[in-house]
């Protein structure tokens, strides 16, 4: 029904606006359209077992979009403003929050774009920050089941020391051709290799890659990978459970030695490559229980939304 907006003009953020329009008035020479000054986030609100509503790791997403803004020479959205607008968007659209027990959630998409018109290559001086929402089910049609992943060596997602660690639309556009190729071959996603040597595992489609090797949770350490809030959460759950965590380079050849593997991200938590193993399964369900209020949130990851 509603989205919320805030404009940055004359060196400051203005008042929050509530809109029912799905469109914005944008100059065709805006920096977002001409030169890609656009960043976004993705997080979820859940209807919990107790009937209350919570948003998972809102502050972490606020910090990440701040980093993305700095990476694209944009004016960062203050964390307080980010959180306030997310909460407003959830409250205004409360009728779209799926019921507890359905496996669905309310997906929240914060978006910041440069709106200053300029044909010359320069950073914008004016921006708009928008928060929109949509009810969603599982990202992959199979949910937490088998989703086969392939390596396509002829494609790179990002350049070394490039923009891969920021959440900007260009990175996703760069993966569309390879993703289409993978789908045509019968796979759900592409596991990219590092763009420099084509030796180490990198991003896994729109998500982080992980594997379980001899009881150790391993995930690639790469400056071209978007730092996943979900992966960060899973690694913390591993440490809480006494599972060793290693963030390091993982070679392609090492894949033959792992017992479990898959992708993790906000949209589907964990998607196993092949048959889900016991460690992946427990981590998936543990994180879901925390999100749904079925298990104690010892790290304070959930923000409760009052009044709904």
Over which residues does each language-model region extend?
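Helix-start/capping segments and mature chain N-termini
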Residues: 1-89, 111, 118-308
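Extended, Lys/Arg-enriched charged tracts that mediate electrostatic binding to polyanionic substrates
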Residues: 98-113
């Amino acid at each position: 029904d509603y989205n919320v907006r805030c404009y940055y003009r004359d060196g400051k953020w203005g008042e929050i606006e509530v809109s029912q329009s799905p469109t914005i008035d944008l100059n065709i020479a805006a920096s977002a359209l001409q030169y890609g000054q656009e960043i976004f986030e993705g997080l979820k609100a859940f209807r919990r077992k107790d009937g209350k509503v919570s948003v998972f790791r809102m502050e972490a997403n606020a910090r990440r979009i701040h980093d993305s803004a700095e990476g694209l020479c944009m004016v960062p959205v203050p964390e307080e403003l980010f959180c306030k607008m997310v909460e407003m968007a959830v409250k205004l659209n409360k009728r779209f929050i799926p019921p507890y027990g359905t496996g669905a959630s309310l997906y929240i998409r914060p978006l910041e774009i440069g709106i200053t018109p300029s044909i010359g290559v320069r950073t914008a001086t004016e921006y708009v920050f928008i928060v929109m929402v949509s009810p969603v089910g599982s990202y992959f049609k199979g949910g937490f089941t088998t989703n086969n992943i392939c390596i396509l060596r002829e494609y790179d997602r990002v350049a070394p020391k490039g923009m891969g660690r920021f959440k900007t639309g260009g990175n996703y556009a760069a993966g569309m051709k390879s993703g289409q190729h993978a789908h045509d071959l019968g796979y759900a996603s592409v596991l990219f290799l590092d763009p420099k040597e084509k030796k180490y595992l990198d991003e896994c489609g729109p998500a982080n890659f992980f594997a379980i090797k001899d009881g150790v949770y391993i995930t690639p350490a790469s400056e071209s990978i978007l730092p996943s809030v979900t992966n960060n959460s899973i690694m913390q759950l591993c440490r809480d459970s006494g599972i060793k965590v290693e963030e390091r380079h993982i070679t392609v050849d090492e894949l033959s030695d792992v017992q479990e593997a898959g992708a993790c991200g906000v949209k589907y938590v964990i998607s196993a490559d092949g048959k889900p193993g016991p460690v992946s399964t427990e981590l998936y369900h543990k994180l879901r229980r925390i999100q749904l209020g079925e298990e104690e949130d010892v790290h304070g990851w959930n923000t409760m939304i009052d009044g709904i």
